[in-house]
Amino acid sequence: MSNLPVEPEFEQAYKELASTLENSTLFEQHPEYRRALQVVSVPERVIQFRVVWENDKGEVQINRGYRVQFNSALGPYKGGLRFHPSVNLSILKFLGFEQIFKNALTGLNMGGGKGGSDFDPKGKSDSEIRRFCTAFMTELCKHIGADTDVPAGDIGVTGREVGFLFGQYRRIRNQWEGVLTGKGGSWGGSLIRPEATGYGVVYYVEHMIKHVTGGKESFAGKRVAISGSGNVAQYAALKVIELGGSVVSLSDSKGSLIVKDESASFTPEEIALIADLKVARKQLSELATSSAFAGKFTYIPDARPWTNIPGKFEVALPSATQNEVSGEEAEHLIKSGVRYIAEGSNMGCTQAAIDIFEAHRNANPGDAIWYAPGKAANAGGVAVSGLEMAQNSARLSWTSEEVDARLKGIMEDCFKNGLETAQKFATPAKGVLPSLVTGSNIAGFTKVAEAMKDQGDWW
């Protein structure tokens, strides 16, 4: 009987990686990598601390703060901070574990980590959020630094919270350094950072489409279902529209907003209204009944979009949270004509859904759904965070065109690396598309494993 705590989210992430390595020829060709897997699955350091702060009534409030410093073989620990009541050590270990390999796939010098708190920003005043961030950073600042650990935003941590956190770090440490990414543009932030994850997942899928069609097709004319309505979903939607596609759904934790007419699409103006709503920390349901939305969209409470979209659609981009596509929903996506699914969120698909997608890919040469895991498809966000770190180190700021061009190059490399690695270690049958989940897992893992071996972390 194990004396380790039950950590379902982390165990799911570990088993997903381990099973893809086992089902490839990697361990046959390199049996020593089994030892590396054992070592890399244990965090280098886990920091847990209390956060005591004062609400607007002058009452003491207590939350738990965490930072999982998982692996630093490739560079400083790098990964977001999440403020949400669901946060626990299992979720942060899963996110940090995924982050190791995602960061490796970018080709930049970044290790993997993740942190956060079970604090819920919803319903809190600006003053309460500022006081919480100040208390949180008062403890976290002892464990981070530009060359040690560089956190960023995540769910519940927007540019505003990053500003509060950065200000407290600067006051306590008396240092201005690139200790956080996602900063404001006038104080060390990078252009394209808010857009990066959403843009990146669309750039990645564009390469998938071009590979399958021999360069004959793109997003133009394709219907795209997106879940979520935060940064990732908003900017993915805007990029899809820019490239000629139609966005047919967005969602939040309370329900989904879906176009009524098969020929309709969200417009940039409607997405801007949704962005304003999210800044005000309100729900999509408040827009659904407004005159601008009621005639064009259906709002379905307590439902995800995947089984509620009218007609056929070609692309699905889960961009809300983990495990948001079930096995049953995966079957429905296939029946709805989806050819490409890429995770804008981390571990957006359950293992049951991934198994269904991969089985369909193997069984249907030339006409299969093709699944891209989050560690590759949504690496654009952390890639531009890495570019922000580079700009901070050089005390330079690049133009949005420079950053976007680098982002496109990184996403192309992520796609090609996963594709070529899959062809090498999990050679598909004739006409079958390579497994991007296998290729991405192996490519990220082997890069980290080799760096750890060179540095004496395993032998």
From Swiss-Prot:
InterPro entries: Aminoacid_DH-like_N_sf, Glu/Leu/Phe/Val/Trp_DH, Glu/Leu/Phe/Val/Trp_DH_C, Glu/Leu/Phe/Val/Trp_DH_dimer, Glu/Leu/Phe/Val_DH_AS, Glu_DH, Glu_Leu_Phe_Val_DH, NAD(P)-bd_dom_sf
Top EC class, one word: oxidoreductase
GO terms for biological process, alphabetical: cellular response to farnesol; glutamate biosynthetic process
Cellular component annotations (GO), alphabetically ordered: cytosol; extracellular region
MF terms in GO: glutamate dehydrogenase (NADP+) activity
Entry EC number(s): 1.4.1.4
The entry's keywords: NADP, Oxidoreductase
Active site: residue positions: 114
Catalytic activity as recorded in UniProt: L-glutamate + NADP(+) + H2O = 2-oxoglutarate + NH4(+) + NADPH + H(+)
Family, as annotated: Belongs to the Glu/Leu/Phe/Val dehydrogenases family.
Subunit structure as annotated in this protein's UniProt entry: Homohexamer.
Protein name, per record: NADP-specific glutamate dehydrogenase
Organism: Emericella nidulans (strain FGSC A4 / ATCC 38163 / CBS 112.46 / NRRL 194 / M139)
Organism ancestry: Eukaryota, Fungi, Dikarya, Ascomycota, Pezizomycotina
Originating gene: gdhA
